Amino acid sequence: MKLKGTKTEANLMAAFAGESQACVKYQYYASKAKKDGYVQIGELFEETSRNEKEHAKIWFKLLHDGMPGTAENLLDAANGENFEWTDMYAGFAQTAREEGLDEIAALFEGVAAIERAHEERYRRLLANVQDGLVFSRDGDQIWQCSNCGH
């Protein structure tokens, strides 16, 4: 499918962004509704959030001609995190400082540090996938079952 550069590609990207934001926003709304004692409303927000997640997945898969592989996803995630900490949040922090909003600038800088750690983690995981070290290691290792904890 030839989407590159089309208005439809832009529409798919906007649809993906909108559905993704709605998914997360409705999770926040669900949490607040439940804290306020509105369990049924919270559950409705959770259900709708799951719906929005699936809608986002439709648009994502069309944009990427299916679901990319794990190595490709790790590289994409690492590159995205790199952009966030080196460019996006650095720029946001600078703007906030210029506007006298030092507390917000500090928050941007703090999140940038977390994004840097995310990038490093994704790059280590990608190296493990590429080197065949996800399920095996040299020497003695302790493995823990992610289901039962044993």
Describe every region a protein language model picked out.
Residues 1-150:
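Non-heme di-metal
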